[in-house]
Amino acid sequence: MTIMEKETKIRELWISNEEFQALEKCNSETRYTYTVKRIIDTEVLWTIVDEEDHLVIQTDGNKKFLPVWSSKEYAQVFCVKGENNYKYSAITSETFQDSVIDYIKQNGILINVFPTKKEPLGKIVDLKTFVEEINYLAEDYYGEIDYFTL
């Protein structure tokens, strides 16, 4: 799947070096909760794409994963020159809803939330769980119901 964003202003989250390093050391559950909250705050999630802007899908045996992060700094770690031709890419909540959700459902892809170089499989959740968590927190924090729909 190719990510083609509309011309929109991406609300980026600025990450200090201290925050970056501290969060990378947290367990996958803490990183997951942090990521979900930041996706709601910024209405953006970050992933990696190849040189043709196709989503990079990780595999482990017969399982497929879409890696997602809360900010480009974390996604950028997976885009090492010479190691691969990946680049980080923002996905707005609108694009995620309109295009990516269907792609994930059609291809049986799980969500790999906030993997790190040390822990390439972060918290693995299915799409339904991911959407339910985001909707629950969005309603709790902002009174928004159905931030995403399946």
Identify what each model region corresponds to.
Residues T2-L150:
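Conserved NAD+-utilizing ADP-ribose enzyme module
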